[in-house]
């Protein structure tokens, strides 16, 4: 039904909608009507002479007509635009103070629910009627749920608002948030309604609310976990173009713990991703969202979330037809915390955010008062710190934060230390009503302020490191303070322009080791020459001449991309015998070979999970993150070596793993067992793990067990494996594939986490970089052959170690596909400075692999 204003605007003599009026009466001029009369001319010649004046009149009339037409068009557009209506939906909740919560309120089909919902809707209608930009345009309100406190009503209200009033309406609704309803409004109902909260909502969130086919209500029973999942999980995909929701409840004075055990929905992209949102309320209001999820997560990813009260709402809004199984989750209730924080009196100790490493609950405040002995000072070291929120600028700690000594800390931070000037310190933790993270893990220590780091160097962050690490060219302090104000030793160090010291042999090695790049300045070759990747200078005529004049192949890389050329050792040979001179054309998404063979057999190197965990104080990998990684167990010895899966029946490993030693026949295939899809060595019987024996071991015939040259072996499984989310092959690089200096590559394995340490239970990962071959030969003289590649950090810290042998070097390419760059072979110690790891260079053996097994 049209409003009074709209009806008036429809009349011929009423309001036109903006205060303009029209009348058909002629205007009076001294009591006479104004008119225009045209008289015939008596003299045609006079008429001809008057022609120009006539044209002026005609042009004036035409101009006036055009102006009036334009004005009329503008007015029509203006009034039409003002009459355009926009659907606006506000979602929120309110408190009903003089009602007690009844169990029947959990059932939206109960009479009690309907009666109370009717009262709430009447009260909302009366509230809106007092707001001029809302009342006339209110269409309907719907109550979706009730919960304790005394009674909290969750609702959404729909409005049909003129386009030009939308901003004003949103502002009016914003001003009504968290308000107490006036007494007159309360008197219109039989209950007291307070604290009305409402926010604009995405209409997709409200769609199909009357359709309960994908709406579920669950109530926790005791402390027993309750399982639920998307419809059809895991055998069929969840519905497309739908809205599903799960209402989770617990008993009064409890909170809920929610964990997604399996999560696989459409990949996050800009096409309107399928989205799972968890709310710390029963109304889908964005400011109360705890987390939003899309994509796929490995089972080991931390997806545990806590509520601040006894309810949670989960929504799944789908807009695609991509086939994904959805999620499986469990929840249970636990007692609400009576307090958070407390007094810690000791010389040292630990504390953490609530429910760490799970996500801390929203809307919480914790304060720890720490006190150490009187004659000491206290420092707090944060070993893990994750307090991130979406769309919050870095350094802007306005939402979740930790406050110490008046300074706030937030976001994701490396290990850092905060200290006091006496024996007491106070740590305050705050989370707001939305978006939580995993929080922090911290320890406090007492120290003597006169000597805070006995026998060590103290970083500006308060961390203590060994004195010999000062001014050694590597930043051991996270704030680089150990490398500030240094005087470099010119005998073996280079002084960067920013005054940092670097090893002299790093100069002109094609890798920028100084932050300002000064170690690579002045290294250019003379005019008309080509600079190789290893720093060597060649005449330009030797570039792209089909010969490896540099020694590292860089002079033959990226030559005549994609064009057929004569075949050499540095070109890519297609199956039809033709060659293309393009760097790494294999499986790059572009057909460079005329027969398309460079894009065949590319079902490899892909991971099923799109999300990986953040590393906290270690290098634990996620389940399924490296699906080609294999654990090799020798009879009676447990895990000894790694391997990589390259086909359903074949693996690659290191030849030195199969050399007989101390009376044990490691060369016998029958003593070995391969575990594929394994993540945790203590869970070899876990679902998804496949166990196989070996049928054959093929060591390279030129393998030298003294120099470790040709350190590669092929292993045939006794029966093929079945590919799954956690078992996939890695891509093998062609013989011409190059891995340039400085490229980031990943090493994985269950080897020792430190030299002389113990093997890891969880699969470890470490990012390392390809090291210049000339530099490597300088560091390990007379030990490096063309079949070897040096990878690591000359600063040490990350490397393969005992037990990692035979495992893969996984090199990520631009499209996310992984190629195996090498095989873990040998090294001097583990992760030592200036002692990079040495790996078997895999492209060198590509033809041998194909000749042996046809892969």
UniProtKB/Swiss-Prot annotation:
Residue numbers on the Extracellular membrane side: 77-855
Keyword Glycoprotein annotated: yes
Main location, first listed in the record: membrane
GO MF entry, a single one: serine-type endopeptidase activity
Annotated catalytic residues: 656 (charge relay system), 711 (charge relay system), 805 (charge relay system)
A Gene Ontology term for the protein's cellular component: membrane
Glycosylation sites recorded in the entry for this protein: 109, 302, 365, 489, 772
Protein name from the UniProt record: Suppressor of tumorigenicity 14 protein homolog
